[in-house]
């Protein structure tokens, strides 16, 4: 899907949201989440439930999403909660690099194999990455997301080059089959 079409699609979806929602327990409850102070980014983070939680808990946090509508929801909630949140409107499927490094990188419910092979370029050496994406096994119970947005069994670990796996699980979570990886960026 081209950048403009993807943005319009996500803008229409997020136009129905008035609040950011809850943080992702995969991140918020993880024993591998470093203590603040640290920099953090939530990639394809939508309305920012996890990003706002990170910001409220002392992390210098950035939220990246293709949808300005989603980012506006997050910015309004950050203002209401009096937390500092940087937002960046960016298409992760584009060839443009983000141009920053973070201590913690979160990327959930987004799948682009080309992007994942370059994810290490966003993480400081020794930094932590949290990646969660539905697998093709999910199609056994659900027709969406469609096949092109799903990872094959074992594929995610292979795509995340430059990371030492701290945790890797592929299983059913709340009736959704996902691959979940927490990794530490290798020090060159």
Question: What positions do the PLM features span?
Answer:
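Conserved SAM-binding strand-loop segment of SAM-dependent methyltransferases
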Residues: 81-92
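Conserved class I S-adenosyl-L-methionine
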Residues: 1-35, 37-46
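A short, conserved alpha-helix within the catalytic core of class I
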Residues: 111-123
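Conserved beta-strand signature within the Rossmann-like core of class I S-adenosyl-L-methionine
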Residues: 127-138
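A short acidic, Gly/Pro-enriched loop at the edge of an enzyme's catalytic core
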Residues: 97-104
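Core SAM-dependent methyltransferase catalytic element
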Residues: 171-188
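Conserved SAM/SAH-binding beta-strand->alpha-helix loop
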Residues: 67-69
